[in-house]
A protein has these predicted regions:
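Conserved alpha-helical scaffold segments that buttress catalytic/binding sites
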Residues: 2-269
């Protein structure tokens, strides 16, 4: 298996002021020994600049140009890791860093996305519940839905095809409907929190892997996005919106990761 290489992405460009602090996550995780635990190389840090708490009047998105400028820089850092034959581990930051990681992969071929998150993050800007913060819309932008400045970075819309995405363990369907979120595309596979519980963690993980590795699917591999808010608030308070009824860490980690680790040995270069 390739060696892990950690890229720090301490960006809060996709967050509202009330949720600032996520940009400290990389240093906190490294201080806690993550690099040693993974025997990982530290492959650099991509700083974000230009944060503003104001919503752009044209796009209804916060910091759209800053996110558009940051994403290629992060993509370059991820590409450098891949060029070394290593396995990139990108530490955010808020969920808008997804645009940089998926941009790195879109430059190389057709990649899928396993989106493990308590929320589907698919809001259109005009109904975004976080004052246009991209962290509530990043999956929509990555699949090409939204203003060009964030949804067509480098003219590569979409960064990932809808039919190459699995949204795993989300539990926000009622909130999305109540707030008028655009519907998730029918060709995007959703394995929500209730399905994970009904199928069991191992079977749900196998379902996700089977879909992403199908013959007509993304031939070059897939990215795993993990937002800590997928976990229950009793075990994960260090998120902007701790909520009950999420995944339990031990059950999830032992059963799901074992399924996904098998595909980590694929050649992503």
């Amino acid at each position: 298996m390739p060696r892990y290489a950690i890229v720090e992405a301490p960006s809060a460009l996709g967050h509202v002021p009330e949720h600032l602090g996520v940009e400290r996550a990389p240093e906190v995780l490294l201080e806690a020994g993550l690099a040693d635990g993974l025997a990982a190389r530290l492959a650099g840090r991509v700083e974000a600049a230009g944060y503003s708490a104001e919503r752009d009047p044209g796009t209804k998105v916060m910091n759209p140009q800053a996110i558009s400028d940051y994403s290629p820089l992060l993509a370059n850092a991820v590409a450098a890791v891949l060029d070394e034959g290593e396995f990139p581990v990108v530490l955010g930051g808020d969920c808008s860093i997804l645009l940089g990681t998926m941009l790195a992969l879109k430059r190389r071929g057709r990649y899928g996305l396993l989106y493990i998150d308590g929320d589907a993050d698919f809001y259109q800007p005009e109904v975004n519940p976080l004052n246009g913060a991209a962290s509530a819309s990043d999956l929509a932008f990555a699949t090409g839905r939204g203003p060009d400045v964030v949804a067509d970075i480098e003219g590569r819309r979409p960064l990932v095809r809808s039919d190459d995405v699995v949204v795993f363990a989300c539990r926000d369907a009622a909130d999305r409907e109540r707030r008028g979120c655009q519907p998730l595309p029918p060709d995007l596979l959703v394995v929500d929190r209730d399905q994970v519980r009904r199928l069991g963690a191992s079977a749900a993980a196998r379902e996700a892997v089977k879909y992403l590795t199908r013959d007509e699917g993304p031939a070059d591999g897939f990215w795993i996005h993990l937002d800590a808010d997928v976990f229950d608030e009793t075990i994960m308070q260090a998120v902007d919106d701790p909520r009950p009824d999420g995944l339990a860490w031990m059950r999830w980690s032992r059963r799901c990761v074992s399924q996904w680790a098998r595909v980590a040995q694929r050649d992503y270069r």
